[in-house]
Amino acid sequence: MNLKLRLIIMNFLQFAVWGTYLTSMSRYLGPAGMGEHIGLFYSVQGLVSIFMPTLFGILADRYVPAQRMLALCHLASGLFMAAAGAYGLSAGPSVAFGTFFALYTLGVAFYMPTLALSYSVAYSLLEQGGYDTVRDFPPIRVFGTVGFICSMWAVDLTGFQTSAMQFVICGALGTLLAHYAFFTLPNIPVSRDVERKSFVEALGLNAFRLFRKRQMAVFFIFSMMLGVSLQIT
């Protein structure tokens, strides 16, 4: 299979996983008696994004090929999301917030690193194949947005917006992507000679130095505000 087509499928599934529940889970949480906790379900995504991508990024750089780490994260995330959905379906109106939220949080914790890993995999494979990442990656990434929209519509048209089934679908797509990444994507060798970094550098905290540049500071501030508004809407 052509490398670009492989990456298109990967990006499509990557964001299709997210689109199954991101815009619709509040319609399930409210009637299920968890309406007052909806904010927590969205905010925990940002919380785990602070440290989980860094931890798995370090592992992918040094010990595990990036495409395998991507597969393992999606497999874990898919299983936890499917478990959350299955629990919600079986519990019905008596679903316990603590149990459901714990399963959901674990699913999100393993999904968030895959956003950065998917970009790393795509860039590495394009470079290995002799492609220009600046020119060739954007058309591939567009299919991620297409995947998000398609899965969002699918959940809407099937009437699963108000059901825990949306999390089961999320888990199924995540598991599918895990198998796809593990068995079809080319291998990305790990870097054995990665230079040792300080704790600050390993966590990427040195990036805050960019705030010294006015243009970058304005860009980051408005990006954060945009991220907040996206979660609210």
Role assignments for model-derived ranges:
Residues M1, T184-F220:
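Juxtamembrane intracellular "pre-TM" segments in multi-pass secondary transporters
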Residues Q166-F183:
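Symmetry-related core transmembrane helices of the 12-TM Major Facilitator Superfamily/SLC fold
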Residues F51-P65, T158-F160:
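Helix-to-loop junctions at the C-terminal end of transmembrane segments
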Residues T105-F143:
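Cytoplasmic helix-loop-helix junction between adjacent transmembrane helices
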Residues D61-L75:
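Cytoplasmic membrane-interface "Motif A"-like loop-to-helix N-cap segments
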Residues M1-S49, Q215-S223, G227-T233:
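Helix-loop boundary and gating motifs at the non-cytosolic
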Residues F12, F80, P93-A116, M224-M225:
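Hydrophobic core of transmembrane alpha-helices in multi-pass small-molecule transporters
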